[in-house]
Amino acid sequence: AIEAAFGSYGVEVIEQGLSTRVANLFSGRDSEKVCRTRAVTEFVQPINPGLLASHQEILDGNSIGATLRAAGFTINKKLLIKTEIRATAAFIALARGTVGEGQSLFTKVYALYAETPDDSLPYAVIAEAYHPDHYPPAHEEVTEIADLKAAAQRALKTLQRFRLKEGLKTPAA
């Protein structure tokens, strides 16, 4: 969706641990990168054995959706939360000042499943805050699974609290 709307797309992993990652999904190149989506991913633990090879590629910094699709999976996103959060200094820096402080950012939290014709494998809960110029594709299927809803709340809190380390404008800086 970012590439179709803005002509380019990239993923910059800002922070990553064994169970979470914070990423900048951007358009542009080099010093012209503009954050279109800031994503906090909480990986479902333990990782399903059928997803381990793809998971390693994702931990190496590759796009979650593109990696899973290349491995033959289809993606199913089940909406957990739809809300707005305010732009923080971190989002403003990643968006190269194209968003104002406190500006509303449309935000979704969803459970991502990697699916085959025979199986549906829970992979992650993802919270995404969107640049005002980038409206995300719709995926409105809702889940009531308690563990996923709890993970959604944790990911949303991390998305709201996330700050760039002192002096860091963008991970490429």
Model-assigned labels for residue ranges:
Residues 1-109, 113-173:
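N-terminal domain-onset segments
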